[in-house]
Curated annotation (Swiss-Prot):
Top-level taxon in the UniProt lineage: Bacteria
UniProt-recorded name of the protein: Probable dual-specificity RNA methyltransferase RlmN
Task of the protein: Specifically methylates position 2 of adenine 2503 in 23S rRNA and position 2 of adenine 37 in tRNAs.
Pfam family, one: Radical_SAM
Residues the record lists as binding [4Fe-4S] cluster: 129, 133, 136
Main location: cytoplasm
Cofactor remark: Binds 1 [4Fe-4S] cluster. The cluster is coordinated with 3 cysteines and an exchangeable S-adenosyl-L-methionine.
Binding site for S-adenosyl-L-methionine: 184-185, 218, 241-243, 317
Organism: Streptomyces griseus subsp. griseus (strain JCM 4626 / CBS 651.72 / NBRC 13350 / KCC S-0626 / ISP 5235)
Entry annotated with the keyword Lyase: no
Entry EC number(s): 2.1.1.192
GO molecular function, one term: metal ion binding
Catalytic EC class: transferase
């Protein structure tokens, strides 16, 4: 467990590197990898079709590839990357948490949430998190390692397969939104997260053919990475986990604020908004008697007034053994009114999955 305020930007050394998987590779790299096995390069397109369009990673399902070639190609590009340990459901089975065991025994989780008009999937980008926010169960557990691009992508592929096969009831049969809000700080695993976004949004069969506009990437405020992300040309939404409008409190709640303060983080966010044309989501966990005062809502509204922004207030999810708890209803209402008084759009998030430790901030608490 990290010390209070301690930050980990680089994953610990010594972790066994995940094996190479087709989802780690660009279309050109897939052709090279297939050719290296002695097979014709066009097999790469067939494999991509099976994985990204049919969600099939079992060679037995690759019926358009000769049986003698399947094992060789599977060994080269479809290693046993991760396996489902268990699924846990709630909300009449429309919310499902998946506990994954990675190739090295590391555990991560994803959450699939099906609504009448949309389907959202919350995915992990790291095993653990090095940002050490004191109210977040994942942050308190520390960082084990970064996930590979394929380990990130496979969470979504499995979710899309589950929807297609009717494993999660109700609502549309295709993912609408993907949020990088599970375990980890996405921008601390920059290259692999960017690679995952490309696989998710490349047209089928090179990728999953999802819309960039349906993807949200969260960050606690790694300013250099935010500025770099602004230059990628993505149309994803950027969500900034702010949690306090003043540096004095944010230094405590979000320790990375001691590196890049509120003003620097917001300036980087506005640059992303300008370059992407997307409004910024400000994530703010309301914590009783800590950051939920109406005057802080007023200060937040003043900071954000006139900007391309939306404030997403999050009732704090209870974590076993934590001193932190959710705001009183009357304090939440006063905070909302204080922000809205400045013309800033603000809503309170519908939190799902609390009973299965699946909501934001709880993904590591039950397994560590």
């Amino acid at each position: 467990m990290p010390k209070p305020g301690e930050l980990t930007f680089v994953a610990p050394r010594g972790a066994k590197k995940p094996p190479r998987h087709i989802a780690d590779l660009t279309p050109a790299e897939r052709k090279e990898a297939v050719a290296a096995t002695g097979e014709k390069p066009f097999r790469a397109q067939q494999l991509s079709q099976h994985y990204f369009a049919r969600y099939a990673h079992d060679p037995a399902e690759w019926t358009n590839i000769p049986a003698g070639s399947r094992e060789k190609l599977a060994e080269a590009l479809f290693p046993d990357l991760m396996s489902v340990m268990r699924h846990i459901s709630c909300d009449d089975d429309t919310t499902r948490k998946t506990l994954w065991k990675l190739h090295d025994g590391t555990l991560v989780e994803s959450v699939l949430m099906r609504y009448p008009d949309r389907v959202t999937m919350c995915i992990s980008s790291q095993a653990g998190c090095g940002m050490n926010c004191p109210f977040c169960a994942t942050g308190q557990a520390g960082l084990d390692r970064n996930l590979s691009t394929a380990e990130i992508v496979h969470q979504i592929v499995d979710g899309m397969r589950a929807l297609r096969d009717g494993e999660v009831p109700g609502g549309p049969a295709r993912l609408s939104n993907i949020v990088f809000m599970g375990m980890g700080e996405p921008l601390a695993n920059y290259n692999r997260v960017v690679g995952a976004i490309r696989r998710l949004t490349d047209p089928e069969p090179d990728g999953l053919g999802l819309s960039q506009r349906g993807i949200t990437v969260s960050t606690v405020g790694l300013v250099p990475a935010m500025l770099r992300f602004a230059d990628e040309g993505f149309k994803c939404r950027l969500a900034v986990s702010l949690h306090a409008p003043d540096d004095e409190l944010r230094d405590t709640l979000v320790p990375v604020n001691t590196r890049w303060n509120v003003r620097e983080v917001l300036d980087a966010a506005w640059e992303y908004a300008d370059k992407s044309g997307r409004r910024i989501s400000i994530e703010y966990a309301l914590i009783r008697d800590i950051n939920d005062q109406a005057w802080r809502g007023d200060r937040l509204g003043r900071l954000l007034k006139g900007k391309r922004v939306h404030v997403n207030l999050i009732p704090l999810n209870p974590t076993p053994g934590s001193k932190w708890t959710a705001s009183r209803p009357e304090d939440e209402k006063a905070f909302v009114e204080a922000v809205a008084a400045h013309g800033v759009p603000v809503t309170v998030r519908d939190t799902r999955g609390q009973e299965i430790d699946g909501a934001c901030g709880q993904l590591a608490a039950a397994e560590r």
